[in-house]
Amino acid sequence: MANSPQAKKRARQNERRAEVNKARRSRIRTFLRKVEEAIASGDSSAAADALRSAQPELMRGVTKGILHKNTASRKMSRLSKRVKALSA
């Protein structure tokens, strides 16, 4: 248990940070799920739109420290490859 005032404050801040990060991670997953659903339905225009809206969310996750840069790039690359194959 945190004993010093500084440690107590850090514990409070960590709890708040964890809540914010949890919400951001959930938001990113929601956008990715929308792309997956559009791909599964076979609608190439909806999939492309969903991918366009998911990209800034992924990159925002990188800048906020939720995702590693390479992880976000890998996810974008794999999704865009699938969307491109859908329209071809």
Curated annotation (Swiss-Prot):
Gene responsible for this protein: rpsT
Q: Which domain of life is it from?
A: Bacteria
Please list the GO terms describing molecular function: small ribosomal subunit rRNA binding; structural constituent of ribosome
Q: What is this protein called?
A: Small ribosomal subunit protein bS20
RNA-binding as a keyword of this entry, yes or no, is yes
Bias-annotated ranges (Basic and acidic residues): 12-22
Q: What organism does this protein naturally occur in? A: Dinoroseobacter shibae (strain DSM 16493 / NCIMB 14021 / DFL 12)
Q: Coiled-coil region(s) at which residues? A: none
Which SUPFAM superfamilies does the protein's record reference?
A: Ribosomal protein S20
Query: GO biological process: what's one of them?
Result: translation
The segments labelled Disordered in the record are: 1-25
Q: Which GO terms describe its cellular component?
A: small ribosomal subunit
UniProt xrefs under InterPro entries:
Ribosomal_bS20 (IPR002583), Ribosomal_bS20_sf (IPR036510)
Question: Which terms are listed as keywords in the entry?
Answer: Ribonucleoprotein, Ribosomal protein, RNA-binding, rRNA-binding
**Could you tell me which PANTHER family the record lists for this protein?**
30S RIBOSOMAL PROTEIN S20, SMALL RIBOSOMAL SUBUNIT PROTEIN BS20C
Purpose: Binds directly to 16S ribosomal RNA.
Which family, according to UniProt?
Belongs to the bacterial ribosomal protein bS20 family.
Report whether Transferase shows up as a keyword of the record: no
